[in-house]
Amino acid sequence: MALDIAMKFYLRSPLRRDRVECRITQSNEPLRPCIQTTDKTLLSELSNQENKVKKRVSFADSRGLALTMVKVYSDFDDELEIPFNISELIDNIVNLTTVEKEHFVLDFVQPSADYLDFRNRLKADSVCLENCMLKDKALVGTVKVKNLAFQKCVKIRITFDSWQTYTDYDCQYVKDSYGGSDKDTFSFDVSLPDSIQSNARLEFAVCFDCEGRIFWDSNKGLNYRIVRHGHRIPYDPVCVSVDQYGSPRCSYGIFPELPTYSGFDKLGPYY
């Protein structure tokens, strides 16, 4: 006997993960490999370079050539003409050498180069040349004197003809910016004549007149000399003396690296 049976089937809903995987489209392109292979063209180029012939060095004598080349120079029949500008330059150099020998220089060491000696001379003589230089055909410098009284007169007595005649030039007072010092400073500027005989001696000394009392600084009796460059006597750079306390003083000779007034005649006054 036939029976009719009715049955219900239920399908579960797909999981969320399954739905996501279904949505992802599968790519047909293959992934790029991480290992790179060498290009075929590069390999072929390397092989071609290896097959090339290596360079070789050959000498000239192996090919029948000379190793040296000799050139013979003969004297010119005509004298070589020097361009005018070069000959003029040579003449100027010769003239500069002559002028260098003829120009005047100081023939003494700057008194203040040895400060202790300068101080002792000022203490003993009440006057001392401090520094001096030649500038533009003029003699300029400074003098230190003791402040013995208010009225003072300082002069430079100079001769241009070996003391056959002489001239006195007044020095100008230099105001002390600090004040209250027991020493005064005077400056001088003496113009040199245009023509001076080659054998004439140029010498000068410093005179200090204070209320009728006369004091002289004559460079210890030698006077301060000005000579031509060619007649200058070189000085021994090593000079040592001992002051009253027994200490050596010579920063110019023993310690030349210390700052002194050595070579001051080429630099200029500091005031």
UniProtKB/Swiss-Prot annotation:
Relate the assembly described in the record: Interacts with glycogen, PPP1CC catalytic subunit of PP1 and PYGL. Associates with glycogen particles. Forms complexes with debranching enzyme, glycogen phosphorylase, glycogen synthase and phosphorylase kinase which is necessary for its regulation of PP1 activity.
Q: Which gene encodes it?
A: ppp1r3b-b
What are the GO BP annotations of this UniProt entry?
glycogen metabolic process; regulation of glycogen biosynthetic process
The UniProt keyword set, sorted, is: Carbohydrate metabolism, Glycogen metabolism
* Positions occupied by motif PP1-binding motif: 56-59
Q: Which organism is it from?
A: Xenopus laevis (African clawed frog)
List the InterPro entries hit by this protein, alphabetically: CBM21_dom, CBM21_dom_sf, Pase-1_reg-su_3B/C/D_met, PP1_regulatory_subunit_3
Q: Name one Pfam family in it.
A: CBM_21
- One GO molecular-function annotation for this sequence? glycogen binding
Role played: Acts as a glycogen-targeting subunit for phosphatase PP1. Facilitates interaction of the PP1 with enzymes of the glycogen metabolism and regulates its activity. Suppresses the rate at which PP1 dephosphorylates (inactivates) glycogen phosphorylase and enhances the rate at which it activates glycogen synthase and therefore limits glycogen breakdown.
Q: Keyword Cell membrane: yes or no?
A: no
Q: What is known of its domains?
A: The N-terminal region is required for binding to PP1, the central region is required for binding to glycogen and the C-terminal region is required for binding to PYGL.
**Where in the numbering of this chain does the CBM21 domain appear?**
119-227
Gene Ontology cellular-component terms for this entry are: protein phosphatase type 1 complex
Where does the signal sequence lie? none
Q: What is this protein called?
A: Protein phosphatase 1 regulatory subunit 3B-B
- This protein's source sits in the domain of life called Eukaryota
